[in-house]
UniProtKB/Swiss-Prot annotation:
UniProt name for this protein: GSK3-beta interaction protein
UniProt KW Nucleotide-binding keyword: no
Origin: domain of life: Eukaryota
Keywords per UniProt: Cytoplasm
PANTHER family associated with the record: GSK3B-INTERACTING PROTEIN (PTHR12490:SF4)
Length: 133
């Protein structure tokens, strides 16, 4: 894979670009923090689990939807999936599908998320329209 930055410009490159350029493995805990920051506005509560072990290959995220449902999510290179129906609890017998994005996963779990995300998108488009862009 080709990256549009030189090694001396790594400080200007995104995290994903640095990982590709340096041949590094992504730290799933950092990825999980980015996921949380990206959609926190559209859920009641969301945070990286401090009680379940996270590392380079897996991280766990606790999320409470606007409907009050709680989930424990597993984040790996394969994507995100529900692994429990309460915070910090992995149910090994639970069989759920991986989602490539947090948006897809939350869209399948929470009508409130869908509404909040849609409203935020409309507000942003309206601001762009008002600014003449």
């Amino acid at each position: 894979m080709e990256v549009d930055c030189k090694p001396e410009d790594l400080s200007k490159c995104s995290y994903d670009e640095r990982c590709v350029e340096l041949g590094e493995v992504k730290d799933m805990r950092l990825e999980a923090e980015a996921v949380v920051n990206d959609v926190l506005f559209a859920v009641s509560d969301m945070h990286v689990s401090h009680n379940l072990s996270s590392g380079l290959d897996v991280a766990y995220i606790n999320v409470e939807t606007r409907e009050g449902n709680r989930y424990c999510l597993e984040l790996t290179e394969a994507g995100l999936k529900v692994v429990g129906h309460t915070f910090d609890k992995v149910n090994d017998g639970l069989s759920s599908q991986y989602h490539e994005t947090v948006y897809s996963l939350l869209d399948s779990l929470s009508p409130g998320y869908r509404e909040a995300f849609g409203n935020a998108l409309l507000q942003r488009l309206e601001r762009l329209k008002q600014n003449g862009q």
